[in-house]
Amino acid sequence: MLQLASIKKSFSGKEVIKEVDISVNKGEVVVIIGPSGSGKSTLLRMINALEYPSGGDILLEGNSILFKESKGKKHPYSEKELSRFRTEIGMVFQGFHLFAHKTVLENIIEGPIHVRKMKKEAAIEEAKVLLEKVGLLDKQDAYPHSLSGGQQQRIAIARALAMKPKMLLFDEPTSALDPELVGEVLVVMKNLALEGMTMVVVTHEMGFAREVGDRIVFIDQGVIVQDAPPQHFFHSSNKNERIHKFLNTLTRNAV
């Protein structure tokens, strides 16, 4: 469904992503983990066309989301054309990114009305279904400032789902939350996985990675160190010292 082919990214001459190849199948949950500064979030932003790679290509269902071909040459898509791909690849950020001056319901119907060109009544009905799905139908008239971080993130997930994406990207969706609020967001994400939503998740929540991930991709210094199913990645037989060090650090920090 999604293929990253020899993706590279440089900032100010420094290469932060080094020829990364990843494929994601329909219905798969791929969890990307690694130390801070390893390139995880940059990778997600490139999948959503918020950052342009310095090299390589990204294919969604066999079609490039970066370039179009004309007369045998590749040309970048316009910003308007890129916006169409972004409706197919939803993204949930760690900072929620809700419109502060709009109610919960207004936040969710904004995209469907203005991008999907839905009628307002139909968008509202869909939004209510999604709010019930994330357990927040009773908050439809509330404003973001009155909600907890966990509630705001669940609204952000509902807003992303309202665009009917083919897959969802999560960029450390629980890292900005108080520990007691993390669980409510992870429950929503687990339910999406059970429903077959294709997801790429950057997270430090190892319990989620172990339980829900179909594959764990460990990135360090812009390079994929390992791409393996969780039963191998977390097993004591995994001999990769860099991964052991990373997991041990997480364990110590959690104490």
Where are the model-predicted features located?
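A short, surface-exposed alpha-helical micro-motif characterized by mixed small hydrophobic
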Residues: A209-E211
